[in-house]
Amino acid sequence: MSDSRVDAKRERLRQKNKRRNRKSRLKGLVAVLAVAVIAAAALVIVIHNSNRTPDKVTGLTADTCYSQVTLSWDKAQHADSYVIYRNDGSETVKAGETEGADSTSWTYEDYDHNTDVTFTVAGCNSKAHDKEGKPSDPVTATYDSSKYAQKIPILGYHKVVTDEEEVSEAGMKTGLIIKESVLESQLKYLKDNGYTTLTLDEFYEWHAGKKEFPPKSVVMTFDDGYYGVYYVAYPLFKKYDMAGAVFCIGKNTAGEIAEYTPEKDEKDQYIKEDAIQKVREEYPKFALESHTFDMHNRVKGKKPALSFTYDQIMEDCRKNEPFGFTYLAYPWGTYSENMQNVLKDAGYKMAFAYNPYFYAYRSDDTFAVNRIKISGLTSMDEFIDIVSGDDPQYNNPDAPEEAEKAQ
């Protein structure tokens, strides 16, 4: 083949490849342009959607307590926050806002349980010209006192012993000693009859009006921190899945708890630091709290609470600081203004008294909550009357709830 023919063939091949490359580049350019168009369209859609008015809020519900209402609702599309409106029958006012689209609950802290309040929630979009969407259907918060406890028996025990131990009638009455089988029968009654035993934290929330519990609710407490409460009562509380609290005398807690040998009548029969830590770790429903560090001694014939200055009481509190106590039961059930002020300043949440023996009401002073003593001579019928809330001798005539019933 001549050189001219070879050159012509090569030229034709070169032109063919050139055309192929041009088509390939054109296809690539078209693909890039197509992607750009799609991306631009998506961006337009995103921008359009981000500027859209939020959808109507749905699923609004109100969980109503004595002094607060917690609202919950479903997340609304195109909303980046929410605004809450409240109407108490006279006017609608802005009650609050959420911080983000995922914040689909809000709590109204100033609720008056005597007044029905209606709420609505609207979604907001900070990028939209029309910032608020259509509000939710209204929901009305109504407090139904018949569904919840309005007074709670707080039972006060002291020493718990086994059935084999000999205890005089006077000891059961004045020493408030109760036998194991008697305590178990009481716990079994509560369990079998649908009672709720509250922790101190739960009672605190109830007292503040922030939580509700069934009418059949009770709190069970033990004073002095005798080790029989740990060895005898504590296993029963775990057996029946009950909550309880022990108020320990700080000076008696140093060291390790002794073996249970009540027949020796040893003086050092108290719950110790190791037992306090163990119970807190394995069964938090059984609280260990303060009965002061060392304020049971009477001075000059006065009751302990009236015998000490503010500084003396504060020093006693500081000695108990390593335990992290936040609740206290007053020695002998009595207290002074000095003592109440110290507890507030020391960061305690609540304190319990025995003066007088009434059911606990929300109207009780947070640092003078009433309790009812239970002794070894309290019959089962008496116990049932007390925990039912129907024993009239323990109704506080000064409590608002009782005053309303008397009218």
Give the ranges of each region predicted by the language model:
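N-terminal pre-catalytic segment of deacetylase/amide-hydrolase enzymes
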Residues: V139-V218, R371, S375-E382, I386-Q407
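Conserved aromatic anchor
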Residues: S67-A79
